[in-house]
């Protein structure tokens, strides 16, 4: 895709020196790659292929991917707007055809904006789950395998091995995950603070989902999850059933 974009850029510049080809093919491939990576992890959860003690780095990686998705859509919107501006400058007038094309591009831009908000909502959901799991980890409610029979690095690298062949997005490393978790846990003294942060993230996700209407994903189910998790985390932050397992 990058080679096609580069070749098209050279062809367009040869004909119109003041115009450049925008990296639309590379952006499209990146968008589809991210969608497949996200689906790969979500299907693994749906099929219950992961243990509870693995969920934290799964949501950590998903948050990273959803952030990339939102950035990719922002880039696509910028490319579309730049393309429309270039066409308008070239035509110098707006007839019925150009107005019709403009309406079509505006529709795509609105769809991109809605999906970008959706991905921000999913990022907040992942952040909420991460903070909740960190809280449960801090108070000892998540069981890990015995150290002599377990290697967290090996599990991490095994789970995300299919992503290691990609250049973009840059694969996340176990050392990055470990540094992130250590930094978080060293600054938090009580799990209730993490539960409050988790509740805040779920509330932000709920607010975003409530403002969406033209997104194909099942918003009703996501809203139900965010509302339920928000209430549960608020109760946990208040010490409700703190002694339960």
Predicted features and spans:
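Extended alpha-helical scaffold/coiled-coil
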Residues: 1-245
